[in-house]
């Protein structure tokens, strides 16, 4: 009886240990598979490559061009090519990012017509929403009047919003209505307060300066009269032969 109970207990313990090991293996390998899936996710990679410093024969000879294109058609049958002869570059457009990645890994710095083939991924064109989230946004275009940011803002510095300047439009309107020799009543008088009237007058300093230092008038030089008598008299020339 005791042996049977011990045997059953050992069997249960072994079953528990085996199940625990299986669960641990599943957890470990499951996590590794998830990590591998994340590492092998090539959806963010571009689908185009740039081949730089391509041999000139690719742009001139048709056979060399077909030979160059055959290197990449192995990875994708729908691949297209854009040749830039002046820059000696070729843009290779694949239908899938996996094909572009394989071609980049296997053909980068391989020999082609005696030159090493340089392959680089093309820049990924992101949408406007993704670009706004991935880059630092500029500050809101708040109108600033007086305060400008420092040359090197310290850590934690924030732009303070200035209050709009107070403009007395009544005063500007009153000044615009003033004219020479006219008066303008700012405040009407009451029984207990006098009225405020503005009279526009000329500056006394300007009049004093004009009397002390009068402006000198420059007289124009008179044009001399032509010598009429000399022109009317006949002229004789003596010539000795």
Curated annotation (Swiss-Prot):
It holds the Pfam family Calcipressin. Gene3D superfamilies: 3.30.70.330. The lineage of its organism: Eukaryota, Metazoa, Chordata, Craniata, Vertebrata. Residues 183-203 are annotated as: Calcineurin-binding. Interacts with protein phosphatase PPP3CA/calcineurin A. Belongs to the RCAN family. Highest expression in heart, skeletal muscle kidney, liver and peripheral blood leukocytes. Lower expression in all other tissues. Residues 7-19 have a biased composition (Polar residues). The gene is RCAN3. Inhibits calcineurin-dependent transcriptional responses by binding to the catalytic domain of calcineurin A. Could play a role during central nervous system development. This is Calcipressin-3. It comes from Homo sapiens (Human). Residues 1-23, 202-241 are annotated as: Disordered. One of its GO terms (molecular function) is troponin I binding.
């Amino acid at each position: 009886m005791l042996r049977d109970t011990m045997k059953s207990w050992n069997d249960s313990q072994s079953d528990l240990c085996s199940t625990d090991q299986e669960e641990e293996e599943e957890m470990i390998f499951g996590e590794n598979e998830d990590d591998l899936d994340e590492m092998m996710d090539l959806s963010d990679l571009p689908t185009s490559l740039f081949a730089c410093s391509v041999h000139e024969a690719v742009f001139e000879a048709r056979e060399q061009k077909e030979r160059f294109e055959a290197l990449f058609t192995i990875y994708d049958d729908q691949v297209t090519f854009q040749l830039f002869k002046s820059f000696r570059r070729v843009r290779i457009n694949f239908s899938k990012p996996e094909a572009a990645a394989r071609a980049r890994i296997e053909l980068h710095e391989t020999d082609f017509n005696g030159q090493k083939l340089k392959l680089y991924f093309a820049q990924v064109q992101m949408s406007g929403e993704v670009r706004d989230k991935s880059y630092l946004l500029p500050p809101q275009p708040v109108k600033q009047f007086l305060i400008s940011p420092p040359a090197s803002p310290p850590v934690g510095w924030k732009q303070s919003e200035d209050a709009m300047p107070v403009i007395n439009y009544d005063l500007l309107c009153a000044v615009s209505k003033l004219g020479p020799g006219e008066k303008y009543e700012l405040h009407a008088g009451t029984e207990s307060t006098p009225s405020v009237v503005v009279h526009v007058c000329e500056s006394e300093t300007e009049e004093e300066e004009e009397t002390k230092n009068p402006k000198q008038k420059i007289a124009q030089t008179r044009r001399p009269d032509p010598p009429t008598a000399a022109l009317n008299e006949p002229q004789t020339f003596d010539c000795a032969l």
